[in-house]
């Protein structure tokens, strides 16, 4: 049988939740708002399939560039090249201030 090359290929451990975090996400993650220029971490929530960024961007930190509907544009640097990732707010976590 031919091997599949789907979006979630090689994500068996990367998209695992710890035992206490299993199940659906809280609604507060779905309705969180960001400001343009705010720093966010891409933290993919595997229980929400809509608006999920590609697995390569898991764990990266970027800057909010704008919004389109329920999704956010996040500017990241991938190997020195600027890229724009489109993700819903369930897959984004605001960066805490280092002050």
From Swiss-Prot:
The keyword Ribonucleoprotein applies. It holds the Pfam family Ribosomal_L21e. Disulfide bonds: none annotated. One of its GO terms (biological process) is translation. GO terms for molecular function: structural constituent of ribosome. InterPro entries: Ribosomal_eL21, Ribosomal_eL21_arc, Ribosomal_eL21_CS, Ribosomal_eL21_sf, Translation_prot_SH3-like_sf. GO terms for cellular component: ribonucleoprotein complex; ribosome. Keywords: Ribonucleoprotein, Ribosomal protein. HAMAP family: Ribosomal_eL21 (MF_00369). Belongs to the eukaryotic ribosomal protein eL21 family. This is Large ribosomal subunit protein eL21.
